[in-house]
Amino acid sequence: MFQTFRNAWKIPELKNRLLFTLAILVVYRLGCAIPVPFVTSSALTQMFSNGNMLAYLDMMSGGALSRCTLFALGVTPYINASIIVQLLTVAIPSLENIAKEPDGQQKLQQITRYAGGIIALIMSLGYYFVVRNMGALKYTSGAAGIFTAVVIIATFTAGAQLITWCGEQIDDKGIGNGLSLLIFSSIVSNWSSLYTTVAGLLTRAAAGESQFYIFLPLLLVLALVVIVFIVIMTNAERRITIQYAKRVVGRKQMGGQNSYLPLKLNMTGVMPIIFASALVSIPGTIGSFMQVDQAAHPFWYAFFRTFNYTSPLYVVIYLLLILAFNYFYVAIQYNPVEIANNLRRNNGSIPGLRPGKPTSDFITRTLNKITLIGAIFLAVVAVLPIVLGNLTGMSIQLGGTSLLIVVGVALDTTRSLDSFMTMRSHKGFLG
């Protein structure tokens, strides 16, 4: 691997892309540390320390939300905008036609960017009133109060848009998926809380709860097993044999060789996890912002409590959303009819099947089976730590969602780097 890095460093374009990606990540982490003016973040500590949905969102932002920094909103506005635009693309024919145009993806990305700005503005307004109600503002009345409100809301909104820009810059000029890498850096930066979790386990064990001497090693072993499981399942694929017919071009005989169509078990990567997390967090986040009083509003209190991170119904909804998004993304990314038509145009066929509809039907059946296995894999890895946390009564910070995102992004980025090097006849990580 060290030799691979040395080889990569010798390629000027790849070296520049790596340095650019690191520079953007440094800018992002700096933005997560720059405090918003006129806010006393220490007054918000209690709100983020109860293991609620805000604590979870704070973990996804690398602690920027609880510290009221420039990038406090994180990637949530852009993710929610992406969900809305992609769902509308399927539902509205005009947007679907735009997506099919040569520059359709650029137009949809522009629409997503505008939608993300609107969502960021709404979230900024909500967070401002939460900060105000918690007594964390230095000025709340008069001209100073109005100026403070404008500055805080504008800063949060601009920060969210700047995050979107950072992700797009990595996509264009860096290595890997920009959005995923930003989330990756946020999660990794927040893993210092693992030391607090381990210290808490040891303290409880020293206080007489000796079972935690056994629970801690088991937890570490489970984390390693989950990592290995994620790596295996992420790289697993179903290969469909493709046979190309022989044809004569001039005096040369072309084709006749066998190839394969790779269908990855986890085709969608970590995006279903990220999108499901963003969507299911909305009610719980609203409830945390509103601070509903149980005595005054028992119905709404019970409703928002239902979407608490540790609620059984939250787990069920989270699981179903992961399954749904997994199928949704496979459906919009892979078209069996188009694949079958491409094979027929290139004189390729699946042994034992006629070109056309029989081939597309076979690919559809195979995709459905693989997608089900991949969706169950994502759901189990994401939900298992939540269930274990509920059973043990402890908040497991190294959750399946964060672990899956970190491992998945690392593998995707490594694969991108390997592909870049393979095109230049260098031995890559995976070769």
Where are these regions (language model features)?
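N-terminal cationic and glycine-rich segments that engage phosphates or anionic surfaces
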Residues: 1-99, 103-431
